[in-house]
């Protein structure tokens, strides 16, 4: 991510230190992760100590300090999804992508995470990709859903 884009994001938030989280979220959304150089630039431009920026970036699960895939897959493992076959959906995603929860594939296409609940229990098992919910998933249709994100 280039410095000009980071500066543009900061300027959109009026360069206010109180907008630190919003700035980091915007950079994360644009870049899919927070590179060290971005944290340093945010620290400098917002006049917030780098240690504070790093603290925020490591405290919230929404932020990543390592590259993430263009598409983030979340598999709900809550009780309702679990009893309806979430594990089979997870295993299928792992087989198709070659990654496990917490990993990103080598071509930075997919990152995979499990979550405790996505809040749509009646649709279980649920897979969310880039914020889009796919409900009543079966292992067989998982491949078709993933192909639509290639």
Would you name each region that the model predicts?
Residues 1-150:
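Signature of N-terminal electron-transfer/Fe-S-associated modules in redox systems
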């Amino acid at each position: 991510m280039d410095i000009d884009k980071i500066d543009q994001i900061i300027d959109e938030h009026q360069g206010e230190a109180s907008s630190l989280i919003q700035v980091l979220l915007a950079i994360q959304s644009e870049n899919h992760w927070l590179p060290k150089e971005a944290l340093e630039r945010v620290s400098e431009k917002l006049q917030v100590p780098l240690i504070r920026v790093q603290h925020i970036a490591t405290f919230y699960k929404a932020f990543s300090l390592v590259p993430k895939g263009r598409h983030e897959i979340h598999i709900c493992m809550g009780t309702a999804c679990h009893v309806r076959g979430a594990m089979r959906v997870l295993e299928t995603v792992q087989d198709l992508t070659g990654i496990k929860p917490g990993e990103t594939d080598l071509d930075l296409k997919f990152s995979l995470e499990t979550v405790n609940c996505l809040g749509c229990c009646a649709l279980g098992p649920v897979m969310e990709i880039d914020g889009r919910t796919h409900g009543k998933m079966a292992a067989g249709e998982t491949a078709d859903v993933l192909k639509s994100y290639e």
